[in-house]
């Protein structure tokens, strides 16, 4: 069967692969576009498997929201170059939309979710690996699902995203709080959420830093000094204790003035916790020249 330009074009639109790769697949499938597409999907999965052991610490976040439901997904790539590619951005957005629509609660469920074109997210990921030439992984997802006000924010570079679950208040306040979390990244919501082990460790550190003169003070005075320092530390690591980035009072004061309460928040930072590989290209070239 003749492999026409229109046939190649149609296969490219279906798979996102290069022209020569589409032509080769059509030739091997004797012009059967469905068989060619299926073969390319299998090939894409094989290529994806081969790239799966390469470190993917870059990427971006996808956000999807519908009323009282919102989802953030982290999709990783190997380089920032691919992370900024329009095809990668579109893929990430489609993953977030599928995660929200399917009601997925974890990454495996996200991978099984269907996209608008009928493919699963995992099938589309394998195709993206083939098309973009890098290891691409769907690493994490977080969601807020309820009847509260949601503050959703993804920083313009797509690297930091936040979902705030606000009881009472309005969307403007919720979004402002999400921006605050993105900027200052508090580990905890309120003082009650700070682990007791952390507080005890900080007490030990503050006591060790004190002069012998201060340590010799009466126990009640010493306790007040230590408590003051610990309260400051706890304020620094909690959303409620921090000074609001859009004002000059604490977040707790702002929230209470609005008659609201932050039930919790979700924060994702792309690549957080992944050890990046530092490439020494000079060493690689030198090694290659010795062969």
Curated annotation (Swiss-Prot):
UniProt-listed InterPro entries: EF-Ts_dimer_sf, Transl_elong_EFTs/EF1B, Transl_elong_EFTs/EF1B_dimer, Transl_elong_Ts_CS, UBA-like_sf
GO cellular-component term (any): cytoplasm
Annotated localization: Cytoplasm
One of the Pfam families matching this protein, by short name: EF_TS
GO molecular function annotations of the record: translation elongation factor activity
Domain of life: Bacteria
Keywords: Cytoplasm, Elongation factor, Protein biosynthesis
Protein name: Elongation factor Ts
Organism the protein comes from: Stenotrophomonas maltophilia (strain R551-3)
Primary gene name: tsf
